[in-house]
């Protein structure tokens, strides 16, 4: 059985502290969340909670996931890194390929990517990308 540690919505300093501890404890990997940003207020309904309220707000840090993997991979030796989920429609395919390949190089191929369509309409609006 494999166990993964979720680190979404954590401050980057806490991620750096927790990654080596998770590795020492025998976890298989770390899961990271992806958002370009979290707006201060939004009307979008969070689909993964009963009341539609997300577990984050506009003050929550969302460091760029490929850079985060590169950093965490330098202080661990075997942990895998899962982006759960990468919001595909918000980026150009070449940018995705570049970021993913860079993370794979720095992590020695310990990067796993889960794609998703996204749920936060305000994030799309900010980038002038149609939400459909």
Language-model segment annotations:
Residues 23-24, 70-78, 100, 104-111:
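Acidic (Asp/Glu)-rich catalytic clusters
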Residues 16, 35, 43, 85, ...:
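A generic "cationic amphipathic patch" detector
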Residues 2-13, 88-132:
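Flexible, glycine-rich active-site loops centered on histidine and acidic residues
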Residues 56-60, 86-91:
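Glycine-rich "substrate-gating" loop/helix at the edge of Rossmann-like oxidoreductase active sites
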Residues 77-80, 85:
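Secondary-structure boundary/capping motif
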Residues 1-75:
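N-terminal beta1-alpha1-beta2 module of alpha/beta enzyme domains
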Residues 31-32, 82, 114:
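Conserved beta-strand positions in the central sheet of alpha/beta enzyme cores
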Residues 51-55, 82, 127-130:
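A short, mixed-charge helix-start or loop-turn motif at secondary-structure junctions
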